[in-house]
Amino acid sequence: MNIEITEYKGQTLAEVTGIPIQSPQEALELLINCAYQGAEKIIIHADQLMPDFFDLKTGIAGEILQKVSTYQLRLAIVGDFSQYSSKSLQDFIFESNKVGRVNFVASVEEAKEKLCA
């Protein structure tokens, strides 16, 4: 896993690339690692997340997003979410984007803009 710490509009961001995140525990370790490096705004790519993240019945998305909130971080997940037909997932994405702590976006540039707005 690669964590690239950068500055954008005077704010510290972490962009995570590399191996998939296979569990909520791995996600927590990643979040803590980024925060330890001074980045409270984190970008990950949807294809890094376990497929069950996008099946809300598993509770994995809620568990990971709760950790983002608990540690007062902000997260952007970059990907094409139109491929998911679940109405509940689309509603979840809409509500998350509305609140702004976790954003589901189409590009890294959009992620940076949302996180640093």
Language-model features: locations:
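Amphipathic, Lys/Arg-enriched alpha-helical "gate/interface" segment within cytosolic domains
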Residues: 2-117
